[in-house]
Amino acid sequence: MKDTIRQLIQQALTQLVTDGVLPEGLSPAIQVENARDKTHGDFASNIAMMLAKPAGMKPRDLAEKLIAALPASADISKAEIAGPGFLNFFQNTDALANRLDAALADAHLGARKAGPAQKVVIDMSAPNLAKEMHVGHLRSTIIGDSVARVLEFLGDQVIRQNHVGDWGTQFGMLLAYLEENPITSDELSDLENFYRAAKKRFDESEEFATRARGLVVKLQAGDPDCMALWTRFKDISLSHCQKTYELLNVKLTMADVMGESAYNADLANVVADLKAKGLLVEDQGAQCVFLEEFKNSEGEPLPVIVQKADGGYLYATTDLAAVRYRSNVLKADRALYFVDQRQALHFNQVFEVARRAGFVGHPMQMEHMGFGTMNGADGRPFKTRDGGTVKLIDLLTEAKERAYALVKEKNPSLAEDELRHIGEVVGIGAVKYADLSKHRTSDYSFNFELMLNFEGNTAPYLLYAYTRVAGVFRKLGKGFDEVEGHIVLQAAHEQDLAARLAQFGEILNNVADKGTPHVLCTYLYDLAGLFSSFYENCPILAAETPEQQQSRLRLAALTGRTLKQGLELLGLETLERM
C-alpha cells in the first residue's frame, strides 16, 4: 500500500510541475509512514513540508494542491491534511478486504519483491575448523540464514557461502597431532580438547613443533599425504558443524562450504594484479595497499596488507579473491557479509581495494552486515564460569533441556516423545528468536529465563499464539485453506488486524533490503497481539451470521498462515499444540 501511495503522490507532483506550481528537476524521496493515530488515517506523508521551500509556498497550501492533484484510486477512500501540512490517507476497507482474500489464495501471501529478482551471495557462519563452533558463531549463522530465507521467498536466487577457516599455520600443529594419534570421527568428538592437547604438545616439544611447521610447508605445497590428512580432519570438523546446523534448523549443507582454502590458487594472482594496477607499496618488506580515506589517529593512511614479508598471505588477500570469484564467476548482484561489526574497517578496506583493482567486473553491491555481540548477564562476552568459551552445541542442548522441563511441568500428561519434541522446538526456537528479535547491530545479554517466558516478545509466546489460531480450525475439523466466502471488514478489531496482515510483503522487503530480521520479529509479535484482541472482541464460532463467521475465519486463517510463514522465515519450527 505504501508503494501505491508513493505512486499517487508522484503522479500528483508531476501534475503540479506541469501546472507550474512546482519547479522542474525535483526528485524527492517520497516518505510514507504508518499513521500514529488511526483517527487521522492509515498512512501519512510529509512531502508537502519537504517541498514547501522550493515551491515558495506554505506547507498547508502546497498540501491542498497535492490533494487536489491526486489521481483517484480504489485503494484510498480519502486523503486529508493534518497539522502543519501532513498528508493523511485512509484505506478503502473493501479494497483492503479484497487484497487479503487474494493473499489467502496465494502461496506467498501477497508478498512480492519491490524490485527485480537478483542473484545474492550470503557469506555466513564461517567457523574456524580448527576448533568447535562456539556461541560467537550463533549470530552470523542464524541472521544470515533468516535473511537468505526471506530473499528466496521474495524470488531472489541465493547462494549461501560458508567461508570456513580451513587453512593456516595452526593446521600444521593439528595434523602433526592427528598423525601421532589416528582417531575416528566419533573419537574426535571434542575439538576443543583435541586443539588444547595439540597446542600443549607444540609448546612442550621442539621436535613436534618442527614437524608441525614442516607439515604447514608440505600442506601449502600440496603434498598428497599431507593433503589427505588435512582433508580427513576437515571432514570430521565439518561433520560436527553440520550437526549443529541441523539442530539449529539452518539451511547450510556441505555443498555450501567455500572455505579459505578454496581461494589458495588465486592468491598469488591477486597480489600480481594489484601490482599491475600500481596499487601496491612495499612497507617493511610487506606488500600493502594504502587508501587515503582510511587513516589512523595520526592522520596517516592505514595499510591493507596482502602479503607478509615472508611471502605469506592474509585474510585481506583471501577476501579479495572471494570478491573477485563472487563477482566474475558467480555473477552475483549483491554480496552480503554477515560478520561481526568489529570487522567493519577490514571489509570497507577490502571492498574499496576490490573496486579500485577492477576485481568487481560484474556490477555487485558489497554490504557488510555487521552485528553486535551476545553477552552474559554481566554485560561481557558470553563465557563459561571458568572463563572458557561456551560451545554452541552445549548451549543448545541446555536450551532443549530447560524447555523440556518447563513444558513437562505445564503438561505432565503428555507422552515423553511429544514432550521431547516440544522441548526441542521451544528451546531452540527461544535461543534463535531471542537473538533475531534484537537489532542486528546491537549487543544483547543472554538470559534463559527471559527467552523461555510465555509472555512478551519471545518464541514461546509466538509459538503458543500460532497454536491458538490452529486450535480454532482443529475444533472445526478444517484447514486454513478450507474456508469459503469473503472477508468483510466492519468491526475496528477486524480492520486493525487486516491492516497489519496487509503489511507482510512490505516487512519482508525491509528485511531483504537491510538485513534486519528483528523487523519481522516485531511484526509477528504485533500480529499475534492484534489477533488476540480480535479473537476476544469478535466471536468466530459464535458469530452472528454464517457470512460473518466465514469472514472472521478467513482473517484467522490468514493470520495463522502468516505467523507460520513468518516463523519459518526466521528459521523456527511451529507446533500444532503445546
From Swiss-Prot:
Locations listed in the record: Cytoplasm
GO molecular-function terms, A-Z: arginine-tRNA ligase activity; ATP binding
Positions of short motif 'HIGH' region: 127-137
EC number: 6.1.1.19
A GO cellular-component term linked to this record: cytoplasm
Primary enzyme class: ligase
Gene3D superfamilies xrefs: Arginyl tRNA synthetase N-terminal domain (3.30.1360.70), HUPs (3.40.50.620), Isoleucyl-tRNA Synthetase, Domain 1 (1.10.730.10)
Main location: cytoplasm
Matching SUPFAM superfamilies: Anticodon-binding domain of a subclass of class I aminoacyl-tRNA synthetases, Arginyl-tRNA synthetase (ArgRS), N-terminal 'additional' domain, Nucleotidylyl transferase
Disulfide bonds: none
Keywords: Aminoacyl-tRNA synthetase, ATP-binding, Cytoplasm, Ligase, Nucleotide-binding, Protein biosynthesis
PROSITE patterns: AA_TRNA_LIGASE_I (PS00178)
GO biological process assignments: arginyl-tRNA aminoacylation
InterPro entries linked to this entry: aa-tRNA-synth_I_CS (IPR001412), Arg-tRNA-ligase (IPR001278), Arg-tRNA-synth_N (IPR005148), Arg-tRNA-synth_N_sf (IPR036695), ArgRS_core (IPR035684), DALR_anticod-bd (IPR008909), Rossmann-like_a/b/a_fold (IPR014729), tRNAsynth_Ia_anticodon-bd (IPR009080)
Reaction(s) catalysed (UniProt annotation): tRNA(Arg) + L-arginine + ATP = L-arginyl-tRNA(Arg) + AMP + diphosphate
Matching CDD domains: ArgRS_core
Family in the record: Belongs to the class-I aminoacyl-tRNA synthetase family.
NCBIfam families in UniProt: argS
Record-given protein name: Arginine--tRNA ligase
